[in-house]
């Protein structure tokens, strides 16, 4: 009976989540200027932008439909390169006080698919260690080896990968797709809200609390042996499997709420 209930809930939740366009960046399908025309006079073009951010302490990115990679480089400017989809309206950059904003918008069309995503590479100066905020619609998002202050990610439809990053706090809301978080150095407080898809977390040096609200799918969380954490888990229709060896110090708290799926914590 419990398995039957899980299946019913999975179908209901998946339908509900994938239909929530506002959360997942596909609300434009309901817009009055959404087009189902299979033809387009637009052609793809290259983007090559560069801007000094020496006086910036926060970068915000509002990305509509793109496969996006964000990395450090040894220059002093933010550099944005890549190829825009034929449906893209382009990339705009703007400075407002100490905030630098990057916006990519896409023409609304029923023909958008993986072959119509823009391909963007954003290089951030290695000297930048401020805040990063990303509001992501459709595509993939990959961040590698950044050292930041506060990180906020709102993902839509697609995979999210944060590899080798360090931060004082991370707030990640996933939509539909997989999430991968790998840290090697210091990390602060972490909040992850699961959507539909797998979540894989591998933590290095732990220096903060973790709160995980599971959605639909499995989660695997790897922590160091004898990590100074106290793990609390709450299961709804899902299952939790806590088998990590931790210390008795309990300096930080991991609060895990299992949605429809499973959560495993291991070394």
State what each model feature region is.
Residues 78, 98-101, 263:
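Hydrophobic residues embedded in beta-strands of well-ordered beta-sheets
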């Amino acid at each position: 009976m419990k398995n039957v209930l899980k299946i019913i809930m999975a179908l209901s939740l998946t339908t509900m989540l994938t239909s929530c366009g506002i959360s997942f960046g596909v609300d434009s399908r309901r817009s009055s200027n959404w087009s189902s025309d299979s033809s387009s006079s637009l052609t793809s073009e290259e983007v090559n932008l560069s801007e000094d951010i020496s006086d910036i302490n926060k970068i915000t990115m509002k990305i509509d439909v793109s496969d996006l990679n964000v990395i450090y480089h040894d220059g002093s400017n933010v550099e944005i390169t890549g190829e825009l989809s034929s449906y893209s309206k382009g990339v705009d950059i703007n400075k407002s006080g100490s905030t630098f904003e990057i916006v990519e918008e896409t023409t609304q069309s029923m023909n958008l698919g993986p072959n119509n995503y823009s391909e963007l590479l954003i290089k951030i100066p290695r000297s930048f260690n401020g805040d990063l905020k990303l509001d992501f619609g459709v595509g993939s998002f990959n961040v590698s080896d950044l050292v930041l202050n506060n990180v906020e990610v709102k993902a839509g439809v697609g995979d999210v990968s944060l590899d080798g990053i360090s931060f004082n706090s991370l707030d990640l809301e996933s939509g539909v797709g997989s999430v991968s978080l790998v840290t090697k150095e210091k990390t602060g407080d972490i909040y992850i809200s699961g959507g539909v898809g797998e979540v894989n977390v591998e933590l290095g040096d732990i220096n903060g609390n973790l709160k995980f609200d599971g959605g639909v799918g499995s989660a695997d969380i790897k922590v160091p042996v004898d990590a100074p954490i106290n793990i609390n888990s709450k299961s709804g229709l899902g299952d939790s499997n806590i088998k990590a060896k931790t210390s008795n110090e309990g300096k930080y708290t991991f609060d895990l709420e299992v949605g429809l799926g499973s959560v495993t914590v291991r070394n």
